[in-house]
């Protein structure tokens, strides 16, 4: 099953057919939007008296979510880039294939030509430190096998209700404050969602391999910043 990412049929085919034997032999695996774990917590408290009521609410969510480029994922696939002409994949001979990365053993790696010994060692060190790659040495990476880091968000709501009597009926005026991503308001280093620049970490030019470590950064968007909204509401009885 293809995740459906892409605004055109051709882009969905060329960028989402993760495999090791060509696009006509697609790999089964986890969809990119399936989060292994998700935690939701909603707490509310209401303090009322004859003149009105104070309402407090906290909403907490934690899930494994991040970005690659401008698309959000819960899972991602480690892949290898093949430099070839006319968009032809030199490994699978397939225009639409995205090569799943083979994770070599130490002995296999020693026999692979790299642009430099330092680059080869950097690749091995990355494998050893990565929780997914280190558990699958000697195998192909799975489609959607790697999981994004945890993302935490905390939202806060406060509203104050004032009761007013209109012709013997109790109406309510409510003043509200909603803060989205409260943690980020308290500390700019909290409540940030991370972005990975690429999951294609190995390149083959027909002669040598080149390893490029992925870079993580803050995803500069509204999901990584706090916001506040004031509201007023009148409720008729």
Give the ranges of each region predicted by the language model.
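C-terminal beta-signal and terminal closure region of outer-membrane beta-barrel proteins
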Residues: 187-237
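Extracytoplasmic gating/loop element in the C-terminal half of outer-membrane beta-barrel translocons
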Residues: 55-167, 174, 202-203, 209-216
């Amino acid at each position: 099953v293809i995740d459906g990412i892409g605004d055109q049929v051709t882009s969905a085919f060329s960028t989402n057919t993760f495999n090791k034997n060509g696009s006509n032999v697609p790999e089964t695996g986890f969809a990119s939007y399936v989060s292994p774990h998700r935690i939701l917590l909603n707490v509310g408290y209401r303090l009322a008296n004859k003149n009105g009521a104070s309402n407090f609410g906290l909403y907490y969510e934690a899930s494994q979510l991040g970005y690659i480029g401008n698309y959000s994922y819960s899972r991602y696939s480690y892949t290898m880039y093949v430099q070839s002409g006319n968009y032809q994949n030199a490994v699978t001979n397939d225009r639409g294939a995205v090569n799943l990365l083979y994770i070599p053993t130490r002995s296999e790696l020693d026999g692979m030509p790299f642009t430099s010994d330092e680059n080869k060692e950097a690749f091995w060190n990355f494998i050893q430190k990565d929780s997914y790659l280190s558990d699958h040495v000697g195998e192909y990476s799975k489609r959607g096998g790697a999981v994004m880091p945890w993302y935490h968000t905390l939202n806060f709501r406060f509203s104050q209700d004032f009761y007013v009597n209109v012709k013997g009926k109790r109406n309510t005026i409510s003043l509200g404050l909603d803060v989205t991503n409260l943690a980020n308001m308290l500390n700019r280093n909290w409540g940030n969602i991370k972005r990975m620049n690429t999951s294609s970490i190995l390149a083959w030019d027909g002669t040598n391999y080149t390893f490029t470590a992925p870079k993580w950064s803050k995803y500069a968007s509204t999901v990584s910043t706090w916001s506040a909204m004031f509201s007023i509401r009148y409720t008729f009885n």
